[in-house]
């Protein structure tokens, strides 16, 4: 049975590589196309499975009854992800994302959510999915519909599980509207734009203080992109600088999916019994290694992460 269950989107990504982004009304040639599996839920599940091994990570989501779904299931199984928690619907197409990527690795994403919107709260109460949630020590929440998020967070806490949440676009709803979810979250993993949307604050400590009024035990983890990451909770503040890819002879190719690689590695490290700081350092390294790969789901294998582990950036810890 799995150590981690991930609840989130499964998409088919069409990556369009261009020299630069077009202006409105302008046509820009596409240099190459890469069609690859994606979706934040699936990406995080695969990232964790690559580090933990076969059958250690389950994905709970929804696909259409189409060719994309068949490809997705095969790919996920090949990656060692438990797919028994995936629902199929005939009322919507499988999710798809159309991603423009420029020469600097920056991206613009347009998404058809499709079947991802069909995972409902009542689906989580079926015995097949409840058995996955009961078996897991960590539940990672990503981007199902709001009602399903609330139900998932509640069930996870009911079972006494560690809950991690990448709030993503839900952060625009604000902390007050999301407080029923936040009360059940142990680790909130978001970026700078999302923390501002969620709390109205750009200062990480002030943002955590606002969140702690809802949940005193919450740990805020900020993904800072090319500046590394940081973590704040009741006990400590910690920051991890970026990995110097140039020193390793590596370069940025595609930043799409690096946050998913980060979260998957953090969850996997915690599931292995590692502490917050070591898990944060490993997650930071995994995210950095992902940007050197062109595919959305380019998270490192266990062997790759271990090979570069000695080059990981070390955390600076401030005890409060």
State what each model feature region is.
Residues 75-91:
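A glycine-rich helix N-cap at a beta->alpha junction
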Residues 137-210, 226-229, 234:
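Conserved beta-alpha-beta core of the PfkB/ribokinase-like small-molecule kinase fold
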Residues 1-4, 204-320:
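Conserved phosphate-binding/catalytic region of the ribokinase-like
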Residues 9, 61-65, 88, 101-103, ...:
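Cofactor-binding loop segments of dinucleotide-utilizing enzymes, especially the Rossmann-like FAD-
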Residues 48, 191, 259-260:
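Short, conserved phosphate/pyrophosphate- and ester-handling motifs at nucleotide-, phospho-/glycolipid
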Residues 1-62, 67-74, 78, 249-252, ...:
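Glycine-rich phosphate/adenosyl-contacting loop at the front of the ribokinase-like
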């Amino acid at each position: 049975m799995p150590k981690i269950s991930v609840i989130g989107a499964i998409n088919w990504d069409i990556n369009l590589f261009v020299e630069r982004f077009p202006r409105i009304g302008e046509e820009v040639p596409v240099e190459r196309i890469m069609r690859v599996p994606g979706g934040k839920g699936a990406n995080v599940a695969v990232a964790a499975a690559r580090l933990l091994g076969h059958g250690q990570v389950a994905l709970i989501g929804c696909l259409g009854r189409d060719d994309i779904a068949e490809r997705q299931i095969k790919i996920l199984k090949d990656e060692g992800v438990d797919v028994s928690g995936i629902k199929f619907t005939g009322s919507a197409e499988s999710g798809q994302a159309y991603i423009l990527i420029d020469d600097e690795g920056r991206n613009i994403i347009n998404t058809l959510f499709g079947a991802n919107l069909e995972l409902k709260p009542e689906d989580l109460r079926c015995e097949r999915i409840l058995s996955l949630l009961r078996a897991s020590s960590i539940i990672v929440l990503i981007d199902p519909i709001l009602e399903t998020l609330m139900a998932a967070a509640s069930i996870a806490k009911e079972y006494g599980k560690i809950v991690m949440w990448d709030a993503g676009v839900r952060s625009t709803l604000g902390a007050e509207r999301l407080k029923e979810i936040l009360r059940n979250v142990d680790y909130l993993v978001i970026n700078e734009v999302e923390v501002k949307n969620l709390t109205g604050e750009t200062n990480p400590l002030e943002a955590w203080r606002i969140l702690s009024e809802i949940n005193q035990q919450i740990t805020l983890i900020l993904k800072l992109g090319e500046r590394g990451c940081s973590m704040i909770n009741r006990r400590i503040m910690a920051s991890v600088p970026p990995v110097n890819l140039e020193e390793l002879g590596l370069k940025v190719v595609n930043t799409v999916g690096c946050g998913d690689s980060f979260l998957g590695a953090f969850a996997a490290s915690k599931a292995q019994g590692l502490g917050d700081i070591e898990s944060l350092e490993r997650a930071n390294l995994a995210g950095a290694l992902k940007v050197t790969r062109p595919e959305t789901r380019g998270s490192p294998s266990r062997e790759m992460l271990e090979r570069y582990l000695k080059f990981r950036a070390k955390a600076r810890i401030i005890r409060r």
